[in-house]
């Protein structure tokens, strides 16, 4: 009888521990979603100049007279098996104080030196935005690059996370020491955002991607740290295909 009672107590304790752990995981997942939702709820931002009038998270890192600068970034990275890793992307700095935007279009290729160490070879093309149009600030001989810049769209302009709550049972990671956190979800090719990416980029795989929400800093909000989203189609040694996006407000350098 005593053994039976001990067994019942042990099983009850085990169930309690599992329930508590699961509850904590679900709670942290909800916190991570809520942290990202503050920004992702603005998507799609079809007219980027609307960001001049959009408020973001502010803390004591901001001067009281500084409205802040939005930094928006989108990049597609492709490395077919056995080939070099190549990426194309753009970053803009949208100053809310002066309502001016500058940035750069970046074309990158990863090479390896004699010792096999990776080395990035980048080409940067300075740009500015006027009347919601992105234009080069210097002459560009390559007509293909010119067109890529003129036709470039950030993920924030066409992506949508109105149904962020539908993503469930994610792989959750949280490190309070850094602090850093992430939530990973397996998507399908029927997902709206996946369809949008396939429509705009030549993605050399039919595999459905995983969505990764990852960040650092206080979950409740911080101007220090980062919040990135990533769609990972392939992640192997010598073979990678992924898309990254970020949008965050930082103190302006002119203040």
From Swiss-Prot:
PROSITE patterns: PROKAR_LIPOPROTEIN. It holds the Pfam family DUF576. The keyword Lipoprotein applies. A lipid is attached at residue 24 (S-diacylglycerol cysteine). One of its GO terms (cellular component) is plasma membrane. It is found in: Cell membrane. Keywords: Cell membrane, Lipoprotein, Membrane, Palmitate, Signal. Residues 1-23 form the signal peptide. A lipid is attached at residue 24 (N-palmitoyl cysteine). The keyword Lipoprotein applies. It is a lipid-anchor. Gene3D superfamilies: 2.50.20.40. NCBIfam families: SA_tandem_lipo. Belongs to the staphylococcal tandem lipoprotein family. This is Uncharacterized lipoprotein SA0096. It comes from Staphylococcus aureus (strain N315).
């Amino acid at each position: 009888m005593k053994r039976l009672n001990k067994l019942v107590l042990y099983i009850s304790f085990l169930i309690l521990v599992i329930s508590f752990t699961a509850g904590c995981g679900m709670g942290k997942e909800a916190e991570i979603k809520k942290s990202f939702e503050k920004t992702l709820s603005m998507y799609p931002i079809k007219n980027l100049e609307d960001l001049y009038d959009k408020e973001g998270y502010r803390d004591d890192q901001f001067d009281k007279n500084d409205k802040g600068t939005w930094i928006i970034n989108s990049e597609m990275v492709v490395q077919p098996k056995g080939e070099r890793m190549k990426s194309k992307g753009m970053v803009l700095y949208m100053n809310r104080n002066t309502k001016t935007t500058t940035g750069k279009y970046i074309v990158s290729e990863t090479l390896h030196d004699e010792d096999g160490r990776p080395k990035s070879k980048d080409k940067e093309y300075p740009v500015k935005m006027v009347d919601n149009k992105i234009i080069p600030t210097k002459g560009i001989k390559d007509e293909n690059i010119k067109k890529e810049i003129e036709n470039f769209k950030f993920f924030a302009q066409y992506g949508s996370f109105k149904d962020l709550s539908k993503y469930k049972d994610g792989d959750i990671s949280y490190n309070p020491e850094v602090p850093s956190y992430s939530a990973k979800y397996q998507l399908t090719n029927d997902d709206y955002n996946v369809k949008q990416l396939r429509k705009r980029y030549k993605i050399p795989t039919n595999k459905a991607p995983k969505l990764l929400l990852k960040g650092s800093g206080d979950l409740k909000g911080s101007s220090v740290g980062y919040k990135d989203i990533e769609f990972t189609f392939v992640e192997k040694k010598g073979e990678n295909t992924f898309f990254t996006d970020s949008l965050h407000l930082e103190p302006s350098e002119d203040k």
